Amino acid sequence: MAKEFLIELGTEELPPTQLRTLAEAFAANFEAELKGAELTHEGVKWYAAPRRLALKVTALAEHQADKIVEKRGPAVSAAFDADGNATKAAQGWARGCGITVDQAERMITDKGEWLLFKQEVKGQPTADIVVELAAKALAGLPIAKPMRWGNKTTQFIRPVKTLTMLMGSDLIQGEILGVASDRVIRGHRFMGEREFTIESAEQYPSILEERGKVMADYEARKAIILADAQKAAAAIGGIADLEDDLVEEVTSLVEWPVVLTAKFEEEFLKVPAEALVYTMKGDQKYFPVYTEDKQLLPNFIFVSNIESKEPRYVIEGNEKVVRPRLADAEFFFNTDRKSKLIDRLPMLENAIFQQQLGTIKDKTDRITELAGYIAEQIGADVEKSKRAGLLAKCDLMTSMVFEFTDTQGVMGMHYARHDGEAEEVAVALNEQYMPRFAGDDLPSNGVSSAVAMADKLDTIVGIFGIGQAPKGSDPFALRRASLGVLRIIVEYGYNLDLVDLVAKAKSLFAQQDGTSRLTNDNVEQEVIEFMLGRFRAWYQDEGFSVDIIQAVLARRPTKPADFDQRVKAVSHFRELEAAEALAAANKRVGNILAKFDGELAADIDLALLREDAEKVLAENVEVMTEALEPAFATGNYQEALSKLADLREPVDAFFDNVMVMADDEALKTNRLTLLNNLRNLFLQIADISLLQK
């Protein structure tokens, strides 16, 4: 027999940004516990609302199945002595099983005969064990900072108020997190019934919706919010900004979603849209509305948690709440524009970037110099890049950015435009932080790219230079910064070398007295290794296999664009018919050469070539060496590897017909030189011996 099973945990308000994670983890943990207990079912569905987590299990078995447990003992040969008496090992095993040796059965396998004990284990009723299973599932939730409440020692993410566990219509007796199970379910705080009883698991969640005015189905609430917000925006001729993270957060904040539209005064549209949007989304959890051409409308959409008979009062209330915040943004914008960005530069002397690395003004000076250096390398406007570097952090000293921190960069752009700075300079102030996250847009031009790379490299080299490389945590976001630099270089194809960039960045930490702010003598090597390590993570995410990435990293290419070409070339080579054989041959060659202690000449001695197979291979290697020079010079590694694939037959013939480690020392050394030259052709691209089958 099987029944519906329900568990609902009623709590105080759960953290909205963690609600989905908690619910999904609860379901996954409980399903794993059911599997471990060998309880069959047809599925587990999770429910989550601001004040509850719930699971409903379809067709959960009411009883564990009976089963036969086998316990194998010692081999018969070890269980009895020469006189046929049971050994101590056999007697001890039998005692542990609660039987005598004579009562043991025998089991014959291809490895011999063994003593065996079979025991029938009766399955337990689900009602007797499900409380413990649920408690274990809850104990395994990802809760960083659990709370205690009252005088209890129990801990959970928020205080627990109610617990309901039903198997069909039967109440499961038990206690979890200090709360005893009963049939009482709490409804909405302001609508429906505050409390009511539930008779069976099948009634959930519909009874909660009907009587308690709580929509427990998270995905259903989210779907309503999305659909109604889109309709509301369309009704005023706009498009709602329904960013998924914000939609998720709002879904986690409401039990009964009611979507409403409000407005604000058009005069606020004179303020940069980013500042208004920051207020609406960040502070108030409102959805901005745009025209089709991305112009902000004087409206916003919000989600109420109550169904009011007079929604206009709810709308007016939200308009009153947001108006002072928008007025603040307007005031800050107007006040900030009374001073030019460049006039705020001296103020950066009073802001510490990092105690050992100096002020933000010190960082600005380094960014300015490094941005100019990079701009020269990539063909961008050097003076504009240096100007953008000089102004890059000035908006940190504005009232707007101080109050609305997420507007840094974008406000710098608006203020720079107001000050009459060149457009490329203004844009660079916003784009210096790009890419902000995986998949984010890159800076749109060379000036922006130069400043963005300079800012990130200064931070990376500086933090590594004072011995604070990231371990587990990464407080300075150096992994993200490194990936940002690599993406800009690779995706724009800039011919930049990390060795040069890091060395230049390091040099800028020199102080007037000739000393450096940096104390780590190995900073250059550590930074380059760290950044090369970011390649592995990035290219794995792009779908390249680990062995391909490692084959290229083995050659330690420090030009990111060059690394990219190598990885793509090796990936293409791997699909060729000859790839597996040549990878194996390279591995064999590497092993042979590793055992040789002597020195090898650069060129082979043609007079010492005796076998036809080695003559053919030598000729092919010589021809290939000359033919591939243009491809290597231009970084056309795919063409080079495609040609090297033609060496499969002469390489196979060589190993089939030539004794490399000949008794004649001269012959042996000459053949090793030939193999070394062969391997070096491949090593100019990657160590293909690392490729797996």
Curated annotation (Swiss-Prot):
Its EC number is 6.1.1.14. It is found in: Cytoplasm. InterPro entries: DALR_anticod-bd (IPR008909), Gly-tRNA-synth_bsu (IPR015944), Gly-tRNA-synth_heterodimer (IPR006194). It catalyses: tRNA(Gly) + glycine + ATP = glycyl-tRNA(Gly) + AMP + diphosphate. One of its GO terms (cellular component) is cytosol. Pfam families: DALR_1, tRNA_synt_2f. The keyword Manganese does not apply. It comes from the Bacteria. The keyword Protein biosynthesis applies. GO terms for molecular function: arginine-tRNA ligase activity; ATP binding; glycine-tRNA ligase activity. One of its GO terms (biological process) is glycyl-tRNA aminoacylation. Belongs to the class-II aminoacyl-tRNA synthetase family. Tetramer of two alpha and two beta subunits. This is Glycine--tRNA ligase beta subunit. The lineage of its organism: Bacteria, Pseudomonadati, Pseudomonadota, Gammaproteobacteria, Vibrionales. The gene is glyS.
